[in-house]
Amino acid sequence: MNSEPKPGLAMSSHFMGTDNQDQYKGTYAMNRLSIANLLNSPSSTLPTGNDFQNFGLERQINEGVLPQLLQNPWAINFWLQFQNAQLQPHLQYAALACSLVTENPLDLSNKTMNMLQKIGVFNSVTKSEDDESVAPEKPVDESLNKSNILRRNYTVEDLTQAVEDIRQGKLGTRRASVVYGIPRSTLRNKIYKLEAEGAIPSKVRRGKIAARRAEAEQKRCVEATAAAALLDAFGNQSDSSSSSPHASMCPSSPDSTNSSLEGTGETPEMSDKKSCSPLDPKWLESIWQNLFKTQGNVVPVDSANISNVDTHTPTPISEKSQKMHGNEEWKRSRPKRGQYRKYDKNALDEAVRSVRRGEMTVHRAGSFFGVPHSTLEYKVKERNLMRKKKDCLYSHDSSTSEDGSQLVTSTISEKSDSSSHTSTPIPFPISLV
């Protein structure tokens, strides 16, 4: 009994042999690896034949080791010490993490990670993160350029082509942004910038405006000359009436015309040739209409005079007949519209009366009398508003009439009072001496 060792005594005299220790460590490591593999392996996979063999070997080893542990209590103590040595870092990390969380629950600084890194549990993880953080940083400009390149889906050539198309009037900003894939704001900013930098667009615009004005003046002069020629051909208007439109349309003296011809290097013959150019039929048609309006009826025309004016211009009667024929064809080809106002005015009045009396609703009266509901509702509202206005006017007139009658009665009463005062004789005492 005394020879048995006590479990509480020191283990100095009861160390296991080196072979037993190595065997125990090997089995322990194999058990830990198998548990880790089981935890890491997905649940859906089934164990293979090799796994069954490994399980069998581990079972045999455990069956061989467990009796030794039960027979030798010092082996159990060594096993517990080994487990504590393996779990000590994890326990320290858990205690430190709990203390940090309880002290500073919202501390997101690097202090906590530095404290945790003092323990050698996460050294590998921190080393890998440090290696990634030490990677050479790229300059900021390159990152910005990359972001700009990713944003831009167009080239500089597309931008210039789009701006040219917008300037020439081929495309608008909206259509150009869709065709070239450029934002509309970018196109606008580019156009504004180019207009602010160079004065070429303003000069071009001024030249276009001047050219348009010159064309308009030339058209007016041609109209005036055609009108004067037609009036001379008819002979119904006086010279003053024929010269006045010419002067009003082309206010230019002969001296000014000669100077202008000399400045441009043209001769009067060339200008006469230009003025005798074939006229536009639209202008002639407008002139004919104005002449017929002034004269009232159709005037007989000399064929010789009109042929002298212009042999290629068609007669107004033929033009009008062609126009009327074209209008008739257009009217025939046009699809027939829907018939509006199929209801009668009396039906509308009856429907309005029935709605205002409360006999029917708007919907029922409209369907009964064949009147659109919107029209009926509008008419009922209009009648109600008119009645309100009439009531207001009547009340105002009645109030004014009552006020006037009160004033008249008050003045009459005042006059009667004054007359009564004046008519009553004042008694004076008469003394007879």
Swiss-Prot record:
Residues 320-332 have a biased composition (Basic and acidic residues). One of its GO terms (biological process) is regulation of transcription by RNA polymerase II. Residues 145-197, 334-386 form the HTH psq-type domain. Disruption phenotype: The left and right AIM neurons and the left and right RIF neurons are connected by abnormal neurites in 40% and 80% of adults respectively. Fails to reduce chemotaxis to benzaldehyde after pre-exposure to benzaldehyde. In mbr-1 and cam-1 double mutants, normal neurite pruning between left and right AIM neurons is restored. GO terms for molecular function: DNA binding. Residues 173-193, 362-382 bind DNA. Residues 304-319, 396-408 have a biased composition (Polar residues). The keyword Transcription applies. It is found in: Nucleus. InterPro entries: Homeodomain-like_sf, HTH_Psq. Residues 235-278, 304-338, 393-433 are annotated as: Disordered. SUPFAM superfamilies: Homeodomain-like. May act as transcription activator. Plays a role in neurogenesis by regulating neurite pruning between left and right AIM neurons and left and right RIF neurons during larval development. Regulates olfactory plasticity. This is Mblk-1-related factor 1. It comes from Caenorhabditis elegans.
